[in-house]
Amino acid sequence: MERLVGKPAPEFEMKAVKGDGRGFTEVKLGDYKGKWLVMFFYPLDFTFVCPTEITGFSKRAEEFRDLKAELLAVSCDSQYSHETWINQDIKQGGLGKINFPIASDKTTEVSTKYGIQIEEEGISLRGLFIIDPEGIVRYSVVHDLNVGRSVDETLRVLKAFQTGGMCALDWHEGDDNL
């Protein structure tokens, strides 16, 4: 896998369902110019770990926006699958309304560019990328299919980057930079 951290983020343009499940939009990297972007890939809709991550990030979306960061979820499912999942009753395995779009990487082009595509399965690993306002990848983490990511850690890392300084082990907001 080619290193992305410190390099311009690979361009993308994808169809997405709006977080409220009411309509579609196009999302592209250029839409986020001037803002931080936390883009996270997940394997499939209607699964077990994925909704815990998506709803976890959604519940804290305002904290990301307060940091001038936008959230974007991506999977290889179609935008229609995303729409159905958002609009399906939670008690029946639905996701419910969320606070950011979910994009469709149906062609797997984007997950391949970001180095997280599992070709033989047609899905992506759990990759998360923090892209700065100039479009540079500042952080990436990739998890196996079975382990979800941490919203707290993502916020901590985002805040650390926004200090503009060097942050030591276990740095937290309010700590001094090196």
Swiss-Prot record:
Residues 3-163 form the Thioredoxin domain. Keywords: Cytoplasm, Disulfide bond, Oxidoreductase, Peroxidase, Redox-active center. Its main location: cytoplasm. The active site is at residue 50. It catalyses: a hydroperoxide + [protein]-dithiol = [protein]-disulfide + an alcohol + H2O. CDD domains: PRX_Typ2cys. The keyword Disulfide bond applies. PROSITE patterns: THIOREDOXIN_2 (PS51352). SUPFAM superfamilies: Thioredoxin-like. It comes from the Bacteria. Its EC number is 1.11.1.-. GO terms for cellular component: cytosol. Belongs to the peroxiredoxin family. AhpC/Prx1 subfamily. Homodimer; disulfide-linked, upon oxidation. Thiol-specific peroxidase that catalyzes the reduction of hydrogen peroxide and organic hydroperoxides to water and alcohols, respectively. Plays a role in cell protection against oxidative stress by detoxifying peroxides. The active site is a conserved redox-active cysteine residue, the peroxidatic cysteine (C(P)), which makes the nucleophilic attack on the peroxide substrate. The peroxide oxidizes the C(P)-SH to cysteine sulfenic acid (C(P)-SOH), which then reacts with another cysteine residue, the resolving cysteine (C(R)), to form a disulfide bridge. The disulfide is subsequently reduced by an appropriate electron donor to complete the catalytic cycle. In this typical 2-Cys peroxiredoxin, C(R) is provided by the other dimeric subunit to form an intersubunit disulfide. This is Putative peroxiredoxin in rubredoxin operon. The lineage of its organism: Bacteria, Bacillati, Bacillota, Clostridia, Eubacteriales.
